[in-house]
Design a protein with these regions (language model features):
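Short beta-rich binding modules
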Residues: 1-139
Length: 139
């Protein structure tokens, strides 16, 4: 890849296959609508396909959930876990769940943050990787 200034425009794609390169549990500085404490999976995501010339690039994304570890199936985090892990979307600890995500793929639309500066996985577009797309992941 070389060295130099990285691409400054956020990655966008209508439908991309994305691989979780890294995931860790961190405390969120935000609270939910009921003012409950939250945690997040802080992830580094690599675009495998679907973003044209931006394929192969990585971006950071945070998936929030209640600090208690309750993760609803319709939340963005729940959709990620179900798409990437399927029936294996559970663990003894949050850290174990985060480690299970590493190396897994899922499909989703990539949009931008509200300010337009950062790439973001779009809620309600997250799904398992189509079998034909998974075969193309030789990284």
């Amino acid at each position: 890849m070389g060295v130099g200034v990285t691409q400054s425009e956020p990655i966008t794609a209508m439908r991309a296959v994305i691989k979780v390169e890294a995931a860790e549990v961190v405390d969120s500085k935000f609270r939910d609508r009921k003012e409950r404490a939250q945690k997040q999976f802080a992830t580094d995501l690599k675009v495998i396909s679907g973003a044209g010339e931006r394929d192969g690039e990585t971006f950071s994304e945070w998936f929030s959930f209640l600090a208690s570890g309750e993760i609803g199936s319709k939340t963005k985090t729940g959709q990620l876990l179900t798409a990437a892990l399927g029936e294996d979307a559970k663990a003894e600890t949050l850290e174990e769940l985060a480690s299970k995500l590493v190396g897994k793929t899922f499909a989703a639309q990539i949009g931008t943050s509200k300010d337009g500066q950062y790439s973001r996985v779009i809620h309600d577009t997250i799904a398992p990787t189509p079998p034909e797309a998974a075969k193309g992941d030789d990284t």
